[in-house]
């Protein structure tokens, strides 16, 4: 089963062995249409933006204005209506997928943890990349060379154990950390 979640932030457990935990809020969602392959079209709320295509979908599935995003998820529901979150109560482990924090155009030292050059005044090689090729042969830069460029904003998945799930407030507590900033939206999938 899959769910759309929002990252609240990190905290820790209080006890003899304190552990770092991540708090996620499971978004309230509505199942609009169920497909034959066990997946379903699910509507959920994210922001306030609505265009004509979304307005048409809201009218088609008779949804309120707040449900302005759609996703295809594996669900346990057998019929259209509220997304069933009861399966999270018995779940032990989930796969969490979030986008990492976007860091824009970054240099090689930040992006790939390169050492860089000496920091002394006489040096003119501080944070630069250095040599990027070989000799006359192959006479080109090899594909996959680690250079400066866009860093972050990549989809990352991790497997985390579930510490607890409060059905009332829809707060899921996971052991360890997950990628992304506080307030980011992602997906979780029950593994076992």
From Swiss-Prot:
GO terms for molecular function: rRNA binding; structural constituent of ribosome. One of its GO terms (biological process) is translation. It comes from the Bacteria. GO terms for cellular component: cytosolic large ribosomal subunit. InterPro entries: Ribosomal_uL3, Ribosomal_uL3_bac/org-type, Transl_B-barrel_sf. Keywords: Ribonucleoprotein, Ribosomal protein, RNA-binding, rRNA-binding. Pfam families: Ribosomal_L3. The keyword RNA-binding applies. Belongs to the universal ribosomal protein uL3 family. One of the primary rRNA binding proteins, it binds directly near the 3'-end of the 23S rRNA, where it nucleates assembly of the 50S subunit. NCBIfam families: L3_bact (TIGR03625). Part of the 50S ribosomal subunit. Forms a cluster with proteins L14 and L19. This is Large ribosomal subunit protein uL3. It comes from Helicobacter hepaticus (strain ATCC 51449 / 3B1). The lineage of its organism: Bacteria, Pseudomonadati, Campylobacterota, Epsilonproteobacteria, Campylobacterales.
């Amino acid at each position: 089963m899959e769910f759309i979640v929002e990252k609240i932030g990190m905290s820790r457990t209080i006890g003899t062995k304190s552990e770092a935990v991540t708090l996620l809020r499971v978004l309230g969602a509505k199942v609009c249409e169920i497909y034959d392959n066990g997946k379903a079209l699910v509507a959920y709320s994210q922001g306030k933006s609505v265009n004509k295509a979304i307005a048409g979908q809201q009218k088609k599935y008779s949804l309120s204005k707040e449900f302005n995003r759609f996703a295809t998820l594996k669900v346990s529901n057998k019929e259209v209506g509220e997304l069933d979150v009861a399966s999270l109560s018995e779940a032990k482990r989930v796969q969490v997928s979030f986008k990492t924090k976007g860091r824009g155009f970054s240099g090689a030292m930040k992006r790939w943890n390169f050492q860089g050059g000496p920091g002394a005044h006489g040096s003119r090689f501080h944070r630069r990349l250095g040599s990027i090729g070989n000799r006359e042969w192959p006479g080109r830069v090899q594909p996959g060379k680690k250079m400066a460029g866009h860093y972050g904003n990549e989809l990352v998945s991790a497997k985390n154990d579930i510490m607890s799930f409060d059905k009332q407030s829809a707060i899921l507590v996971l052991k360890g950390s997950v990628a992304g900033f506080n307030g980011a939206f992602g997906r979780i999938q029950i593994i076992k």
